Amino acid sequence: IVNNSFGAVKVANVSIEAAQGWSLAAFGDKATLAHEKVNSNKFGFSLALGNGEKKLTDNKNTSKQTLLDSAVEGCFMSGVGDTSANSIGISYDAIVTPVSEAVTNTAIASVLFIIAWDAV
């Protein structure tokens, strides 16, 4: 994420919503989902912003989950003119249950990032 504004911003919220018949599951050891029924269409997701802590899906809600509900370390960006701090990297990973045939060109989830001004 790159902040090209003249003010500081932060990632204030991140949520994920399952789509197209897929369900959210806990992200963890791949072996956990590998033992699920074939074509059960479950996936776990992990996300980290900047050098911040990984946020993981869990088993509490299979359709939509909030991964981040307030800005934490790694979520803050300065404005234009400070190239050392006006962007953050995003790293992510996913695990899925076995499928009987390849799944291609299918959006199984959407991830929503809410960016807000960082009022100092």
Region locations from a protein language model:
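Surface-exposed interaction patch
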Residues: 1-63
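C-terminal, structured domain-capping segment
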Residues: 2-10, 66-120
